[in-house]
Amino acid sequence: MAVAADRLQELPARSERVLRHAGIDRLFHWLTAACVLVLMATGLLPHVGVQFDWTGIHWVTGLALVVLVVFHLLRSLVWRRLRAMWFSLAELRTHQVGKYSVAQKLMHHAMTLMVLSAVVTGLLMLKKIRTPLLLRDPYVFSAHTWGVIYVIHGLAALAAITLVIVHVYFGLIPDNRMYLRAMITGWMSRGDQRARVTGIRAGEKHLT
C-alpha cells in the first residue's frame, strides 16, 4: 500500500500536465505497432528456417493494417491534422517547436512512405494466393512486373524494419522516456514539456 501511495504521488497532478496523445491516437499507434510486428515476423521468419503456415496470418494482418492506414489518412484529412506534420525551412533555421519536432516529422513521413509502398504492393500480391476476397490470377502481371513488385515490397519492408528499430531505440533512451509515457498514458508533465522544448531548440534528437 505504501508503494502504491508513493507511485500515486509521483504522478503529475492534472493541473501540472498536458494532454499529448488522445486515446484514439494511442489506440491507433499500438494497433499499428502490433500489425507491423506480426507482418515482420510472418515475413522474415520463414526466410531464416522457421516454417509455419504464415501466409494466412500475413495477408489478414496486412488487410488490418490497410484499414488502420485508411482510418489514419481520413482522420487526418477531416480534422486537418496533416498540417501539423509539415515543416518549413524557417522552422529548420529557427528551431520552432510545435507538437512534433522536425526529426519526428521526418520519421513519420519516412514510415508513411514505406508502409504505403508495402501496403500497395502487398495488395497486388494477393492475386498470387488463394483468398476469399480475390480470384487468384498469377498471370495478371508479367514475370518482370511481378519481380518489380516483389523488390519494392521487400525493400519497403526492410526500410520499415530499420525505422522501427530506430524508433524503439530513441523511445527507450532515458532522455526520451517522457514520449513513451505519453504514448501509454496520453499525458506529459509540464516540466517534461518545457524540457522537451529546450532540448529541441538546443539540437537534441527526438525520433520517437
Describe the predicted segments one by one.
Residues M1-T208:
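Membrane-embedded alpha-helical bundles that constitute the cytochrome b-like, heme-associated redox core
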